[in-house]
C-alpha cells in the first residue's frame, strides 16, 4: 500500500481487524517493515497493525539530504492523519525507538503505550563520528561495504557465525537500502538526544533490548531507572535486532504490555 504523507510516498502494510486498537511498528536503520514479520503474525488477531518503511527505506521514497528526527516524527503524524488514525500504540527498534522517544515527547496525546527497543536514546561525539564515517563509505562505494560490519555489530557472535536465518534476512535489507535513505537517517542518528526529556513522559513505556546489545543494553537499564513507572525486559541471547533473535519472547512481552 502506498500512502502520500509529508511530501513523499510511504510504503505501508495494514493488517488485523478493523476496530481493534492500532499498533504502529517502526523499523531500524537499513531494514524495512518486514523486520517485523514475526510480530505481525503473532499480534494481528488482536491489533490493527500499521507497518511502514521509514523515510528512505524499503519501498518508501528516499529524498536526498540529511534527515532529522523531527522530520521522521512529522512523517509518522502525517501518516496517521492520512490514514485517520487518531491514536495508536508504538513499537520501534533502534532508529524506530528514537523516533518513538521523539513522538512520546512531542505528541503524547496521539499515542497510548510505547515499546522502545535497543537504542541508547542519544548520540555521542564518538558515535557521531562513526556515523559520519559510515555516511562517507555509503556515498563513495554504496551499501555493499557496510553489510558485514553491520551484521557483525548487530548479532551475537554465535548467531553471526552460525549464519542464522535472521542474519541473511538483514543482510539483504542492508544491501538494498537506498543510499540516500541510509545517509539521511544516519545523519539523524549522528545528532540526537531524547534522553534529557524522557523522564517527563507520562505514557506507559516498556523498554526492551537484547542482553548482548552492548552500550544499548546498559543505556536501556539507565533510562528505565530514570523514567518512573516504566518497565524493562532484557531478552537472553539476543543482540541489536532482538525481535528477530528472540521472536517468541519479544512478541509475548509486547503483547502482555500492550494488553495490560
Language-model segments: residues:
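Conserved HGGG/HGGXW glycine-rich cap/lid loop of the alpha/beta-hydrolase fold
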Residues: 8-61
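Acidic beta-to-alpha connecting loop that harbors the catalytic carboxylate
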Residues: 17, 211-213, 237-239
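Active-site loop/oxyanion-hole signature of alpha/beta-hydrolase fold enzymes
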Residues: 37-44, 50-91, 95, 252
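Flexible "cap/lid" loop of the alpha/beta hydrolase fold
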Residues: 101-106, 111-145
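Conserved alpha/beta-hydrolase catalytic His-Asp/Glu region
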Residues: 122-130, 140-199
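Conserved alpha/beta-hydrolase "acid-adjacent" motif
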Residues: 214-219
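Catalytic active-site module of serine/aspartate enzymes centered on a nucleophile-bearing elbow/loop
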Residues: 230-260
Amino acid at each position: 500500500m502506498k500512502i502520500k504523507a509529508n511530501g513523499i510516498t510511504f510504503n505501508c502494510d495494514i493488517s488485523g481487524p478493523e476496530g481493534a486498537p492500532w499498533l504502529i511498528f517502526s523499523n531500524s536503520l537499513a531494514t524495512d517493515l518486514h523486520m517485523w514479520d514475526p510480530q505481525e503474525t503473532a499480534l494481528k488477531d488482536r491489533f490493527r497493525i500499521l507497518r511502514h518503511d521509514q523515510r528512505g527505506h524499503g519501498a518508501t521514497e528516499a529524498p536526498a539530504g540529511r534527515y532529522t528526527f523531527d522530520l521522521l516524527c512529522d512523517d509518522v503524524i502525517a501518516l496517521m492523519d492520512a490514514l485517520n488514525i487518531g491514536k495508536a500504540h508504538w513499537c520501534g527498534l533502534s532508529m524506530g525507538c528514537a523516533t518513538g522517544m521523539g513522538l512520546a515527547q512531542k505528541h503524547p496525546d496521539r499515542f497510548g503505550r510505547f515499546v522502545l527497543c535497543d537504542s541508547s536514546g542519544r548520540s555521542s561525539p564518538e558515535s557521531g563520528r562513526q556515523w559520519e564515517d559510515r555516511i562517507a563509505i555509503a556515498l563513495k562505494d554504496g551499501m555493499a561495504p557496510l553489510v558485514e560490519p553491520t551484521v557483525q555489530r548487530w548479532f551475537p557472535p554465535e548467531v553471526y557465525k552460525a549464519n542464522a536465518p535472521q542474519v541473511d534476512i538483514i543482510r539483504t535489507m542492508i544491501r538494498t537500502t537506498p543510499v540516500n535513505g541510509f545517509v539521511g537517517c544516519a545523519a539523524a542518528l549522528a545528532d540526537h538526544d531524547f534522553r534529557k526529556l524522557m523522564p517527563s513522559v507520562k505514557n506507559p513505556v516498556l523498554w526492551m533490548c537484547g542482553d548482548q546489545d552492548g552500550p544499548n543494553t546498559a543505556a536501556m537499564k539507565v533510562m528505565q531507572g530514570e523514567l518512573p513507572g516504566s518497565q524493562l525486559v532484557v531478552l537472553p541471547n539476543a543482540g541489536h535486532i532482538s525481535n528477530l533473535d528472540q521472536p517468541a519472547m519479544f512478541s509475548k512481552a509486547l503483547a502482555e504490555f500492550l494488553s495490560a
